[in-house]
Amino acid sequence: MASSISNILNTKLRFTGMASGLDTDAIVQQMIRVQQAKVDKVKQEKQLLEWKRDDYRSIINMLRSFKDEFFDVLKPATYMRSSSTYYAYKVKTTDENVATAKSNGKVAMMEHTIKVEQLAEKAKMESRVGELGLNGLSMDSKISEVANSLGLNLEDNKLSLEINGEEIKISADKTLNDLISAINNSDAGVRISYSSFLDKFIVESKATGADAKIDVISNSNAKNLFYGLGFDVDEVKYGKNAKFKLDGKKDSNGQEVITEKNSNTFTIDGVTYTLTGVGEAKITLTQDTDAIYEKIKSFIDKYNEIVEKITTKVTEKRPRSGGTDKGDYYLPLTDEQREAMTEDEIKKWEEKAKTGLLRNDSLLHGVLERMRSAMNDLTEAGGLFSIGISTGSWRNGAKLFIDEDKLKKAIEDNLDKVVEIFTKTSEISYSPDNSSELRDKRYKESGVVERLFDVLQDYIRTTRSESGQKGLLLEKAGLVGDVTEYQNTLTKQINEKQDYIQELINKLYEKQESLYIKFAYMETALSRMSAQSSWFTQNFNR
């Protein structure tokens, strides 16, 4: 750092020591070393704060990654707050050409029989072959040409038509191909395709079911266009609902009930069916213990990684240059020190200087203690230990350990209890502004995942409380991409250090200039004395 400061300060071209023969630059630099040392010290303090902030942010990112994976409702496969996530089944069907199925949370029955009488279909129309060519048109024909050929009305040099009540407008200088794209991209709910090989159009509704339709007869332009393209447009075309009988369900007259759905994929009592053909199929579900176990294990493994990371940060000691408990702590290198070292030496030094900066950090201790409590305290449904998940020693951060056999047995024997331990939800919603009484009540009524969710919210929440506060870790170190990246405690301290550094450099510059002026006066005086001495010598020697 001393040399960098010298570079900043020595921006003037100076001619020094001409009369005295002294190395004025070296003398001045030596005389301001105390001030340079002050700047170096504050720069080191600033660097330590920046490294500390980086350490905090690495933990923030780890917690956010954990939250994104297991607490995101948009990721149902790993959303551990939902009971549905814990119910997994193996599914077998006797005829996949009739129907397939998968579980969607807890199912009411494990065996089902489905008789498919009709698949859901889209509304569909096909044009006669070659009709476009017979009208002397092509897909590249201008809308004006299409209008003239098919008797369409243009207004303000635009074609307007309605399909399913949705108006579509296009300029006369556009092409038929552009019109097809405009229809497909509109909210009319239909899609048109064209085969140049067959010179044939196909129109389909985007949705299936009896409510899906293609209505072009209510608008003269639309009717004439489609008629001219070779379609039969005498009536509105409708799709079809899927029709099936499920599990022999009967009505009051003893007749099997025919159920209709507007799609071939639908969910009934936790089972999602996909119909593939007409016929009968039997579907059997069996609980997939291994899949449920793996979901829980993945969650616990990620939790343990966080516990291990934070435990390491709050317990690792700052190394000293003289070994254990001896010598000074490793500090950030000054520029002068860096210039005297190799890249490898610098890397090794900085690794040590970055170690132990969060030792005994109270904020991280708080995260750790609350996470441990959330997972280890009893819930109203029992504790994790009762299903084979126990806490290790405090020396290894009290990580959780899974007894695979015991957990799998708990899943097989009483999955509902396992789910309740993890996901039981309080009637009180999370809020950073909840009173201590409400927090205590919510904690008591919640499962371990809900409790852990509250911890994450308190520490890495990006929304503000009524007092304007975000998560505690964000207020401390900030989150990249969030307003707290620049508005947080550590960044404020870093900026204050930078301001102080600039203040010290300004004072150092002033002192250096003052010294150079004094030496310049000295050089001038010596030069005059030398000139006088020469004059006396010359005159007395005559």
Outline where the language-model segments fall.
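Juxtamembrane membrane-water interface segments immediately C-terminal to a transmembrane helix
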Residues: 39, 50-53, 512
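Structured, hydrophobic secondary-structure cores that serve as assembly/anchoring elements
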Residues: 311-314, 318, 508-541
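Short, glycine/acidic-rich hinge or "gate" loops at secondary-structure transitions
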Residues: 78-83, 196-197, 313-329, 538-539
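Bacterial flagellar/type III secretion structural subunits and associated motility module proteins
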Residues: 1-47, 68-199, 204-310, 339-506, ...
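Acidic/charged coordination and interface sites in well-structured regions
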Residues: 65
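Long, contiguous alpha-helical "rod/stalk" segments
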Residues: 54-62
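Intrinsically disordered, low-complexity segments enriched in small/polar residues
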Residues: 324-346
